[in-house]
């Protein structure tokens, strides 16, 4: 495992730990709000069991004398405000859980890609030691992108990209055409990384960033 991969794994673990901590804090606040709502309902219960909607005037239209009107009004107001806070907080919890699940799914996909890469690399190790010529180099990768999930790294030299190889490569438009026609379909990508061949599976996919890959490549001088 390269130092870049180790760093990326460490950052992912730290990000997940921070997300879990945020969710725990949200749940603590949720319990506090629910306790406050219950306390205010207890106040209403202590006032002749009056609820949120019972009238505060008697049949003749006068303020009821059998309950503490100030306490009732205050408790009702507090309950409404706390219920609004609770609703907003639950939306935050839902979003945080969604992000955590998405992060876990991305990690699982990355781990599977790394396992496939390792297996392919072991098979490639028994092939001819002569390295094929590359036609392009990766100079940037966005975190969480399809390229990142597939295991592509900065400075990887591309030997094959789907049907594009050194023999038929003319310009980056060749790669762009393959990508546009392969959305959602896995492509075989062979790269040279620190003197070794690596076989990857890259699936062009729409994601949060630009394009279908989330990486930038530049052609090599031929």
Curated annotation (Swiss-Prot):
It holds the Pfam family Nas2_N. InterPro entries: Nas2_N, PDZ, PDZ_6, PDZ_sf, PSMD9. The modification Phosphoserine is found at residue 128. It comes from the Eukaryota. Disulfide bonds: none annotated. GO terms for molecular function: bHLH transcription factor binding; transcription coactivator activity. Acts as a chaperone during the assembly of the 26S proteasome, specifically of the base subcomplex of the PA700/19S regulatory complex (RC). During the base subcomplex assembly is part of an intermediate PSMD9:PSMC6:PSMC3 module, also known as modulator trimer complex; PSMD9 is released during the further base assembly process. PANTHER family: 26S PROTEASOME NON-ATPASE REGULATORY SUBUNIT 9. Belongs to the proteasome subunit p27 family. This is 26S proteasome non-ATPase regulatory subunit 9. It comes from Rattus norvegicus (Rat).
């Amino acid at each position: 495992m390269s130092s870049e991969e180790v760093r990326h794994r460490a950052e992912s673990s730290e990000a997940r730990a921070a997300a879990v901590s945020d969710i725990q804090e949200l749940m603590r606040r949720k319990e506090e709000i629910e306790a406050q709502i219950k306390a205010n309902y207890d106040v209403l219960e202590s006032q002749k069991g009056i609820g949120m909607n019972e009238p505060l005037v008697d049949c003749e239209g006068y303020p009821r004398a059998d309950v503490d009107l100030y306490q009732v009004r205050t408790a009702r107001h507090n309950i409404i405000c706390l219920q609004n806070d609770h609703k907003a907080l639950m939306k935050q919890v839902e979003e945080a859980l969604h992000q955590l699940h998405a992060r876990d799914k991305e990690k699982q996909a990355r781990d599977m890609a790394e396992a496939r890469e390792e297996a392919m690399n072991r098979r490639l190790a028994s092939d001819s030691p002569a390295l094929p010529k590359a036609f392009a180099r990766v100079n940037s990768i966005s975190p969480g992108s399809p390229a990142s999930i597939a295991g592509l790294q900065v400075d990887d030299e591309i030997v094959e990209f789907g049907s594009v190889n050194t023999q038929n490569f003319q310009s980056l438009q060749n790669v762009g055409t393959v990508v546009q026609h392969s959305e959602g379909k896995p492509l075989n990508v062979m790269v040279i990384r620190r003197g070794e061949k690596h076989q990857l599976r890259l699936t062009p996919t729409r994601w949060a960033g630009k394009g279908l890959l989330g990486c930038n490549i530049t052609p090599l001088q031929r």
